[in-house]
């Protein structure tokens, strides 16, 4: 009986520091989570403020330049691409005309599908050879 009491007392003595450590870790963890929440919310606010400042700057720049298009519907500026080039647009018009008149887009078909129309570009096989 006496050994059982000493075993319980020894167990309590040994386990007490662990329970204190786990409770302090848990409180530190909650404090850490709170700090992360505060930091992330302040970053989000800062980001939205910076975004709105940049958007206003871009809007004022487009108005100053007399840009008739201004901002696009989605709120972003139109970024020029190769498709805005007049020569490329002319090429597309010619290709559309040829496609309508000839029934095929012969140049792009040849580039896209290879020399004998197979769906594996430039492999040199006929369509029949592909399935064997």
From Swiss-Prot:
- Is Oxidoreductase tagged as a keyword? no
Q: Name one GO cellular component term.
A: host cell Golgi apparatus
Please give the superkingdom of this protein's source.
Eukaryota
Where does the UniProt annotation locate this protein? Answer: Secreted; Host Golgi apparatus
Motif RxLR-dEER, residue range(s) on this chain: 56-74
Keyword set for this entry? Answer: Glycoprotein, Host Golgi apparatus, Secreted, Signal, Virulence
Instruction: Let me see what the UniProt entry remarks about domains.
Output: The RxLR-dEER motif acts to carry the protein into the host cell cytoplasm through binding to cell surface phosphatidylinositol-3-phosphate.
Protein role: Secreted effector that does not suppress pattern-triggered immunity (PTI) in plant host.
This chain belongs to the protein called Secreted RxLR effector protein RXLR-C22
Organism, by scientific name, is Plasmopara halstedii (Downy mildew of sunflower)
């Amino acid at each position: 009986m006496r050994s059982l009491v000493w075993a319980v007392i020894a167990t309590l003595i040994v386990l007490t520091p662990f329970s204190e450590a786990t409770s302090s870790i848990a409180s530190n963890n909650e404090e850490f989570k709170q700090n992360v929440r505060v930091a992330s919310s302040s970053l989000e606010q800062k980001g939205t403020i910076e975004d709105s400042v940049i958007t206003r700057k871009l809007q004022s720049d487009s108005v100053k330049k007399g840009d008739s298009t201004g901002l696009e519907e989605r709120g972003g500026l139109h970024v020029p691409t190769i498709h805005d080039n007049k020569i490329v647009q002319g090429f597309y018009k010619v290709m559309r005309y040829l496609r309508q008149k000839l029934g095929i887009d012969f140049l792009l078909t040849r580039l896209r599908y290879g020399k004998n129309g197979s769906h594996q570009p430039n492999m040199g096989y006929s369509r029949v050879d592909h399935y064997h």
